[in-house]
Structures are given as C-alpha cells and as structure tokens.
Amino acid sequence: MAVWLPAQNKFYLPPQPSTKVLSTDEYVSRTNIFYHASSERLLTVGHPFYEIYKEERSEEVIVPKVSPNQYRVFRLLLPDPNNFAFGDKSLFDPEKERLVWGLRGLEIGRGQPLGISVTGHPTFDRYNDVENPNKNLAGHGGGTDSRVNMGLDPKQTQMFMIGCKPALGEHWSLTRWCTGQVHTAGQCPPIELRNTTIEDGDMVDIGFGAMDFKALQHYKSGVPIDIVNSACKYPDYLKMANEPYGDRCFFFVRREQLYARHIMSRSGTQGLEPVPKDTYATREDNNIGTTNYFSTPSGSLVSSEGQLFNRPYWIQRSQGKNNGIAWGNQLFLTVVDNTRGTPLTINIGQQDKPEEGNYVPSSYRTYLRHVEEYEVSIIVQLCKVKLSPENLAIIHTMDPNIIEDWHLNVTPPSGTLDDTYRYINSLATKCPTNIPPKTNVDPFADFKFWEVDLKDKMTEQLDQTPLGRKFLFQTNVLRPRSVKVRSTSHVSVKRKAVKRKRK
C-alpha cells in the first residue's frame, strides 16, 4: 500500500534581491582643487537651566535657554559650485557634468576656559542615602515631603558628528496601551523607543537615561531642573551606521565618562509592583524600604589632555556609502561639549551699584548665565558627477531633489494635447485649477538648527588659513624650505708649506 508522506526537510528560500547601493566613489570623480571655509566667532548667551519669558504666561522669550548639556547643530550652507567662474574651461563641461563638494577636513574651535558644569533641582527627590545608611527609613510612602535642594555635576560628554543630513537620536517615551488590554489608573504605562531628529537645543543624556521626563515623570522632582520638561536624546549610532546611503553620519568622535557619586532611593509608593515576599525575610514591624534606587552621576576631572576639539580631523573614508559628498551644498554638524560649562554668577545691587555699609543679602539680586563660543573650519574638495543615465538613475533613487537643484528633468514631456487658456483669470473662462505653483520646499524647514552661511567664506588660498596650512602639510603639498646657514665670520687659517724631500 503506497502512503504519501510530507517531506521532512525544510527548504531555504533566499530573500528577494534588493537594489545595490553604490559608493559615491564609483560615480563621483575628484579634482585637485580644494577650498577652505571658516565661520566667524559664534557666540551664544542665555540661562543655563530654563528660558525666561517676558510675562508668566507669555510666549515671548527674553532670555533663551543656553545649557552646556544641549546639542549644538550647525547647518553649514555652502555655495553652489556650478555657479563658479573657473579660469580653466577644461575643468568641467556643464552640458555633461555637475560639480559637488566633498568634505576632506574639519576643525571645531572651542573658546572659553575649561569648567565643570553644575546642575540640580531645588526640590529634588532624594529620600534616603542607601549607600551608607545609618538607619532604616521605611516611610517612603508617607505624606511627608522629603525633597531637598541638591546640585550635582552631570556626565561628561564630548562628541561631534557630521553628515549632509541631520543626525538621528533615540529616547524612550510614552506609548499607547494595546487595544483591549485591561489596565488600571496609576499602573506603569508602556514605553517605546522613538527615533527623532536631533535639533539644536535638544538635551543630552547627563546620566539619568535617554527618556522623555516630561511624559514619564509627573512629579517633576526626579531629575535636574534643566531636563525636567525635556527629552534627553542619545545619538542612534546603530541606525545611522546601518543607513543605506550614509548621509547622516560621515564619521563621529565621542568621549563619555562618569561615575556614581551617590546612591540613593526615591520616595513614593512602589505602585502595583511591590517587592515579592519570597525575596526577603519579614521584619517584626513589617517596615520594608523601597527598591527604587538610583545613582547621581559625576563627570569627574576635566583636563586639556582629553579634549576632542581645537584640532584638525581628516576624512579619507567615511563609515557609510557616502564618502563625504555634501549633497544639496550643505552639511550638518552636531556637537556636544559640557567641559566648558562654568555657570556665570552675576550680582547687581538694587540701585544698579554696589550697596554701602554692611552686607545684606536682600540688597543684591543674583542671576545666572552661560556662554558658549565656537568656530567651524572645513576643507572641501571640488568633485564632478557625469550626467550619464546610470548616474542620474542612482541619484534620483537616492534623492530626487538633487536632480531638481541641478535644473534637470528626468521625466519626458507629456505626449497628450493639453488645453491652455490665454485669459484664464478672466470672467469669460472657466475657473483656473487650484494648484499652487511648485516651489523648492526645504525638507528641514520645520527643524531648529544654527544656520552658518559659508557662501561668502570660501577661499582657494589654503596657505593663508590655519586649517589650510595644516592640510597642505598633511598631504605633502607644502613642506618647509631648507634654510641655508651662512657664516658671518671669516677666519683666515695659515697653512704651513709642505717641504718636499730631495731625491
């Protein structure tokens, strides 16, 4: 009797082939022309903890928030190289080629002295010292307000990354409950990891995690005051490294350090998640402390030996497929540096002059300010892209806006006969089609960046700029000439005549 049995082995079907992403080196050719661009001295002044409004409920900001724990995202605007007038007509053919910029060097200058940044909260939730406890405090769920005024130094962070698109950040935030899932009021809500664009002014992780504190901490006492209404973002290095085109991060440099300064516990009940009874032996008074532990960070020593800024960086190979090509004639530089975070204390007398007599604290008004100083210098290389059908197809798949900026049309004209009215806006004809004219829309118009216009800052004389001279020495283009030492004193030496022997 013949019996059919299913096959016991499992067949592996390979995934569908995807479009191969080519490196920019395969369709972008580089020239031997380099340019230097440098910004002016970039300064910003503000309050280190919060914004100051003109009135209590007004939206007019009179003093901005300038914290050393914020991201600085510079949008470097470069000129269009296709509009340059080159003396060498054989450099490129505008009918067959287009010019783009390639990043080769970068230096981020930082002014101001090194200093420890200080943060804190006047009503910080510090219930008990659980690192060195001297007594058992189990009244964390009582009605007594145990919050204190506490300051600390945050995690020390130095980081910068550059690309032709803004960097991505990640943080944990509140999410919705699943449909049909039963939950009660006061239950711990579900959270999810979100990816957002890092904008200028976003807060950095200072040692309390990358999360949305405004949505996940309702009592506004668990973290320092500068992040209590913000979301601390951490750069999503994993996602940017796996990006197909590699436009968001050509390369990055980072240095982070911290240690646990104090270990404490939080006040408040533990909600619907108490400590399991099988994890401890019961006490006679049934007073069990809370397990909501946390540590206060400390960035420790700040020294000039560990500085990442005020030094040049050269790009030979990017981490992604984009090897430093600035599509759209722009670059996005994301910077974090809280090693120069000294808060400036300003004291002013009530009559705008020092008070006479004995010191009275109420006679003076105290203010806080924080200042930052930057300078950005870059070396860019002139590159060419041939307008071949293959190259245009690659670039159009990557970003169609690049083709539009080059004033090219990849779609053929329509073969149908359309109607065109001469007096379309008159009362004698039909109503015009309500289609707004198509304009170039900035894809990053809704984001906040520090725009730095470098269109009038380009120079080809690299030996006249500090970064340009470093680049020339690095590439063996310029070497110091050998100095000939000439003797200024002449000493006459008398030689004795050599007597010849007579034969």
Swiss-Prot record:
Compartments it resides in: Virion; Host nucleus
Q: Which Gene Ontology terms cover its molecular function?
A: structural molecule activity
Q: Does the keyword Disulfide bond apply?
A: yes
Q: Output the InterPro entries linked to this UniProt entry.
A: Capsid_L1_Papillomavir, Capsid_L1_sf_Papillomavir, dsDNA_vir_gr_I_capsid
Q: Which keywords are on file for this protein? A: Capsid protein, Disulfide bond, Host nucleus, Host-virus interaction, Late protein, T=7 icosahedral capsid protein, Viral attachment to host cell, Viral penetration into host cytoplasm, Virion, Virus endocytosis by host, Virus entry into host cell
Could you state one GO biological process linked to this protein?
A: virion attachment to host cell
- Provide the family line: Belongs to the papillomaviridae L1 protein family.
This protein is called what? Major capsid protein L1
Name its species: Canine oral papillomavirus (strain Y62)
